[in-house]
Amino acid sequence: MPTPATASEFLLVDVNGSAQIKRSGQSQYQSARGGMRLNIGDLVRTEGGAQVRIRCSDLTTTWTMNSNIERGVVWGCPPDGGFSLRVGRQSDNTLGGIDPTLPYIVTPRRTVISDPQPMLRWNPVAGASRYTVQVIGSDVTWETEVSGTQVQYPGTPPLTPGVDYRVIVEADTGASSQLDVGSETATFELLYPEDLDLVAADVAQIREQGFPEETEALAIADIYIREDLLAEAIATLEPFVASGTQTLEVYQALGDIYRYIGLNLLAEERYERAIAIATSNEEIQALADARSGLAEVKVLLEQPQAEIDLLIQAQSGYERLNDTERIQELQARIDDLT
């Protein structure tokens, strides 16, 4: 299973009135809005009668910041309570999901699951009318044949928590999910029951706090990401894509997850939408973040020049914000590619 990233994240839950944020390492303030990601060292400033809520990096505690003050995001949070989110770093790249002629696994893929009877989904193959589906593990061998592109695992034989399983799909055209370049990492395992209880308690705590709908979804997705329940994080956020959300963090989060689990055509779509919204809103930080994520997808799609162009564009955005750490990080990446 994945190795955690190094940075803890905070979430700006909502903003009532006028507020700004200043990122750590940057010299400029920018307008604050609900859904924004924050990190240790970031400052939040309220004006007039403004009020903001910040969800701490323990992923459940929330504190309220009142008007006419400036505070670091950690100010109202418990000490030493942060978790490291597992996706979204520049190096979180996984091959896979790039050949539309293959029935590559969509879900469950490089994830922990909580449901012992998961829905299995794969990419549709043109011309295919039947698919043979297998679930393979050290204690499970199961097979069925279906005409669609999804089927629910019946729970028999039962999955064992902590054991790696693999879904294999073969179309009647001969195309196989095993030909996907990311098939080796496209495994899943069942969450232990005691961990499931903890996740459910944390999700319930978020739901009790009255977050705006999309911010609540982002906060719940963070809890799932913490536990490697990436399929559930996706299932939490994708309905907002279907409804046409303009909250760019939804697309950014999905792009990060898809890139991490090796669904790179889907990652490309989500990052491109984040870029479009950030461009329209003139949000420099978000635009640079989405471009740097899309850049990594482009190299996995064997488009290295597109990656370099996007990294240079992202670097230009960070330069406008005087974010020296990200400027240097992207320059090192550019140097690796040229």
Language model region names:
Residues 5-26, 45-53, 57-61, 65-94:
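Glycine- and acidic-residue-biased ligand/ion/polar-headgroup-sensing regions
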Residues 72-77, 83-217:
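Long, contiguous interaction/recruitment modules in multidomain scaffold/adaptor proteins
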Residues 205-246, 256, 260-263:
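Alpha-helical segment of the N-proximal tetratricopeptide repeat
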